[in-house]
Each structure stands twice: as C-alpha cells, then as structure tokens.
Amino acid sequence: MTRARKGTLVQCDPSIRALILRMDADRNDIIYEELDDTHLLVDPSKVEFIKYELNRLLSENIYNPLDEEENA
C-alpha cells in the first residue's frame, strides 16, 4: 500500500547538500528522499534544526582576521 508523507523541498548547492546528508547520517530522520544533486525532500519539522545546524557548521569555517589580531 502506498503511503503519503508531507515534506519540504530543499534546494541547495552540492556542498550544503553534503552537510545535510552528514546530519542525516547521524540521525536518519531528516531526509525523506534525495531527488538530485541540488534537491532534497526533508521532514518539515526538521527544517529549523537544519537551518540551525548549517549556521553553526558554516560559522566554524569563517575566517576572521580580527581573531588573529586579538591573539597576537
């Protein structure tokens, strides 16, 4: 029997897609379907979590030259 679920379509570049896939590998409850290289169907209740985690992960990778001046 076919089962329908409500989902949210996420469009992103492949690098962000890889981060979301890594998040899902830990939890296995975020992604419903990988549609192609730039589209994912995700659980609508997890969208805010995805945004929060992406902001956290991306902020770790931001270079701030002022940090070097403070540490010098």
UniProtKB/Swiss-Prot annotation:
GO terms for cellular component: transcription factor TFIIH core complex; transcription factor TFIIH holo complex. SMART domains: Tbf5. Pfam families: Tfb5. GO terms for biological process: nucleotide-excision repair, preincision complex assembly; transcription initiation at RNA polymerase II promoter. InterPro entries: TFB5-like_sf, TFIIH_TTDA/Tfb5. Signal peptide: none annotated. It is found in: Nucleus. Its main location: nucleus. Keywords: DNA damage, DNA repair, Nucleus, Transcription, Transcription regulation. It comes from the Eukaryota. Component of the general transcription and DNA repair factor IIH (TFIIH) core complex, which is involved in general and transcription-coupled nucleotide excision repair (NER) of damaged DNA and, when complexed to TFIIK, in RNA transcription by RNA polymerase II. In NER, TFIIH acts by opening DNA around the lesion to allow the excision of the damaged oligonucleotide and its replacement by a new DNA fragment. In transcription, TFIIH has an essential role in transcription initiation. Component of the 7-subunit TFIIH core complex composed of XPB/SSL2, XPD/RAD3, SSL1, TFB1, TFB2, TFB4 and TFB5, which is active in NER. The core complex associates with the 3-subunit CTD-kinase module TFIIK composed of CCL1, KIN28 and TFB3 to form the 10-subunit holoenzyme (holo-TFIIH) active in transcription. Belongs to the TFB5 family. This is General transcription and DNA repair factor IIH subunit TFB5. It comes from Kluyveromyces lactis (strain ATCC 8585 / CBS 2359 / DSM 70799 / NBRC 1267 / NRRL Y-1140 / WM37). The gene is TFB5.
